[in-house]
Amino acid sequence: MESGPAVCCQDPRAELVDRVAAINVAHLEEADEGPEPARNGVDPPPRARAASVIPGSASRPTPVRPSLSARKFSLQERPAGSCLGAQVGPYSTGPASHISPRSWRRPTIESHRVAISDTEDCVQLNQYKLQSEIGKGAYGVVRLAYNESEDRHYAMKVLSKKKLLKQYGFPRRPPPRGSQATQGGPAKQLLPLERVYQEIAILKKLDHVNVVKLIEVLDDPAEDNLYLVFDLLRKGPVMEVPCDKPFPEEQARLYLRDIILGLEYLHCQKIVHRDIKPSNLLLGDDGHVKIADFGVSNQFEGNDAQLSSTAGTPAFMAPEAISDSGQSFSGKALDVWATGVTLYCFVYGKCPFIDDYILTLHRKIKNEAVVFPEEPEVSEDLKDLILRMLDKNPETRIGVSDIKLHPWVTKHGEEPLPSEEEHCSVVEVTEEEVKNSVRLIPSWTTVILVKSMLRKRSFGNPFEPQARREERSMSAPGSLLMKEGCGEGCKSPELPGVQEDEAAS
């Protein structure tokens, strides 16, 4: 990539704040959206025990996801709060017999120049041709981006920096007053822009087969636009809830192994996800699950995050997160609870606690026992694991390290998972990397880009079906929508104005 012109000696962060403050964002009317497309599906094929995966061997077979009829969006999937849904970062899985071989992966690119042109064929941003819109959100939109030189598609998030700064942090909200990053002391207070840079610097260096990869970050200081390029996972979420045709127990076991390894990697990097659920788990071409959507994630110091704010999706929230005690609670334990709810969804197609009213749902989560339906019939080992993951007491709830050793996960020791040392390496960022996490470079003065892309809409994973996206304040991933007749070089239709969903408190 070519180098941009020299930037003046002024502090680039202060310069960006000044530039962003000068940007006036007009509110446009919400564009009409079409109905949700039908989703085809059949029962997932029965899984035989996977053979060892070695370089050059066949990838794990991918079951077909279940069909879903049009439905009203429920508390089982609607997130609480309006935060940036940024599926980001990196990836490992399986036992010794189920681990995807690590392949060489290029580092995240830092662009020195953002060049945008509106040609007869399409809107082009550097080497990317922007095509159909595949997602919307509170901070911008997601568009399908085609890199002609690589003959490859990506998901490009176009964000409003002004809205990011207003929210005091990317990709999450600031910690509430009185919250502590560690048990021993208060969290380090960062300026909004410093938090943006620090978290992008970390996300750019995450590298794991069970976390979606951030490819490139582009910045245009003269405009209110920040561009994040991610791997495009066309298969979308592993499941949508509720679901009439859940997974066979063996398939659920393999997917849980992926999730646990990805979660262990994030916790090793001192990140708690806070919104683990089936729609935030994307299916890769290799058949493995990748964690996405870090919209309400938190970084922490010390051994665990001590949280006091509510975030995530109502039906996946842990009892301690919705308690009125006012006490802080463990971030890692929250992720385990949500993973337990997800595992329940995998085998039963619904959440263990369901209600149309949020207060009643909270009461059920805090007070009612987990009930296992008679059908489908599952093993006692699986029930035991679910009950231990859905322990209402976070102090006695099973941890990630013990889940990896559970008999159901390992088939009684026949298929052990790799140790933390084998698949996790701590990501550390220097002050220089934080400073350079996003290049502040001037764009071409003749550029026109789509401010209507940035107007007011809840924005999360780029795989969210259009109809469901209307009903939520923070999107979770759904099937990838690619408009018919839009080829690699086609002209993107005029971008509709988008409205920002109000945050649910």
Curated annotation (Swiss-Prot):
SUPFAM superfamilies: Protein kinase-like (PK-like). Its main location: cytoplasm. Keywords: ATP-binding, Calmodulin-binding, Cytoplasm, Kinase, Methylation, Nucleotide-binding, Nucleus, Phosphoprotein, Serine/threonine-protein kinase, Transferase. Widely expressed. Differentially expressed in various brain regions. GO terms for cellular component: cytosol; nucleoplasm. PROSITE patterns: PROTEIN_KINASE_ATP, PROTEIN_KINASE_DOM, PROTEIN_KINASE_ST. The modification Phosphoserine is found at S67, S74, S100, S458, S475, S492. GO terms for molecular function: ATP binding; calcium/calmodulin-dependent protein kinase activity; calmodulin binding; protein serine kinase activity. Residues 435-440 are annotated as: Autoinhibitory domain. Residues 28-66, 84-105, 460-505 are annotated as: Disordered. It comes from the Eukaryota. The modification Asymmetric dimethylarginine is found at R78. The modification Phosphothreonine is found at T108. The active site is at D275 (proton acceptor). Belongs to the protein kinase superfamily. Ser/Thr protein kinase family. This is Calcium/calmodulin-dependent protein kinase kinase 1. It comes from Mus musculus (Mouse). The gene is Camkk1.
